[in-house]
């Protein structure tokens, strides 16, 4: 047990203790969260993982501690999907890329052969939908982050805007131009049925 009286001297409210052991080529990480004022344990967890996953375990522990102390979900074990740009002004190369929220583990997901725009995660943060132009024709793609597998959801006429997932992750919502005006459509990812959900003379995006 920690010496709570020492931590009270500096008015600490919470304290984390932990240890890391190397067992059978794996890391075992244990930690405890303590309430200093009440002098009692608030949480105790242990994780076993391969050594190169140590950063991920650190992020998971940070999320657990953050949620226990604040009541809100942590964001440490999250990733950012973005469009990377490089090259001269007249020949910009855009690639789909992903990194941890703290900037580590940056990885390119596309080669830069085509223009890519507006990447969006699904609710589980395992799939990404994005817009790309193939021979100047807009296409909506689905990409599995873990396997690298991607598929074309559909080719759409005219201008296409910002595909994204529905809150349940079962549909893609997008805007594209048809018959001279833009409306918002949904596509069911299971049966690929497209349904128009707006019908206004003005532009809907």
Task: State what each model feature region is.
Residues 2-64:
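Amphipathic beta-strand/beta-sheet edge segments enriched in Tyr/Trp
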Residues 29, 78, 94-96, 138-140, ...:
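Repetitive beta-architecture junctions, highlighting loop-to-beta-strand starts
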Residues 73, 85-95, 111-114, 131-140, ...:
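A flexible loop/linker signature enriched in serine peptidases of the S9 family
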Residues 63, 73-104:
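An edge-strand/N-cap motif at the start of beta-rich repeat modules
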Residues 74-76, 123-124, 167-168:
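Residue-level detector of Asp-centered blade-edge/turn motifs that repeat once per structural unit
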Residues 80, 128-129, 169-173:
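Hydrophobic beta-strand positions that form the internal "hydrophobic ladder"
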Residues 1, 100-117, 143-161, 187-203:
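Multi-bladed beta-propeller domains
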């Amino acid at each position: 047990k920690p010496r709570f009286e020492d931590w009270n001297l500096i008015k600490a409210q919470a304290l984390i203790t932990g240890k890391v052991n190397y067992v059978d080529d794996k890391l075992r990480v244990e930690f405890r969260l303590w309430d200093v004022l009440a002098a009692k344990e608030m949480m105790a967890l242990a994780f076993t993982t391969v050594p190169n996953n140590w950063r991920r375990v650190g992020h998971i522990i940070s999320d657990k501690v953050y949620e226990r102390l604040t009541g809100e979900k942590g964001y440490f074990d999250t990733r950012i999907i973005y469009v990377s740009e490089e090259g001269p002004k007249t020949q910009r190369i855009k690639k789909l890329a992903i990194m941890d929220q703290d900037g580590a583990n940056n990885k390119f997901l596309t080669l830069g052969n085509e223009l890519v725009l507006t990447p969006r995660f699904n609710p589980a943060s395992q799939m990404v939908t994005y817009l790309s132009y193939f021979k100047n024709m807009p296409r909506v793609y689905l990409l599995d982050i873990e396997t690298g597998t991607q598929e074309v959801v559909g080719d759409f006429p005219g201008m296409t805007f910002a595909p994204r997932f529905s809150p349940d992750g079962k549909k893609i919502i997008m805007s594209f131009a048809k018959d001279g005006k833009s409306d918002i459509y949904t596509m069911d990812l299971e049966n690929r049925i497209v349904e128009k959900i707006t019908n206004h003379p003005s532009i809907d995006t």
